[in-house]
Amino acid sequence: DEGDPGAFMDRSILEGDPHSIIEAMAICGYAIGANKGLVYIRAEYPLAIKRLKIALEEAKQYGLLGDNIYNTDFSFDIEIKYGAGAFVCGEETALIHSMEGQRGEPTTKPPFPAESGYRGYPTNVNNVETLANIPIIINEGAEWYKSFGTEKSSGTKVFALAGKINNVGLIEVPMGTTLREVIYEIGGGI
């Protein structure tokens, strides 16, 4: 949950390409042996919710979600959970509590969500931006992805430029891009 008022990266991905998130969640579910995924989304994102629901129905119609996907032993489904947009729900234990209908407050670890998370089950928590990268990395390869960024921090990062900056909007830059480059070269300065 991106409760920060100026952040809209995850919403943009869910509005623009919800299928990438569904694909990534199914891949992750297969990799870890899970049969259910949850998408925690702010109720204040009606367009993202609408498009995600449509994409989920399409995935089910094409046999990409549900029981015995492509006539295999693998079954996987995705459920939408609605959040209230509290900034603290970006922390994984707070997010899990909110999905369970509790107050979205973080708790101390251990136990870590991977051991005992949503409803006491082992839970893997990832954000939309991370998930959106999975299908393209699988298609293009790790070496391709590592060609962006630095030796120690490969890949790209999405930022929302908002507030007192000349060029507002979403940008995706290689890891290692300086704040000066983001603000002055891409954002046009303040």
PLM regions and their residue ranges:
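Short amphipathic, charge-patterned alpha-helical segments
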Residues: 24-28, 174-190
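Glycine-rich phosphate/pyrophosphate-binding loop regions near the starts of catalytic domains
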Residues: 1-18
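Short connector loops/turns at beta-strand edges and beta->alpha or beta->beta junctions
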Residues: 1-4, 30-34, 164
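Hydrophobic alpha-helical positions that pack around
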Residues: 49-175, 187
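Metallocofactor- and cofactor-centric catalytic cores in central/energy metabolism, strongly enriched
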Residues: 15, 46-47
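Histidine-anchored nucleotide/phosphate-binding helix
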Residues: 17-31
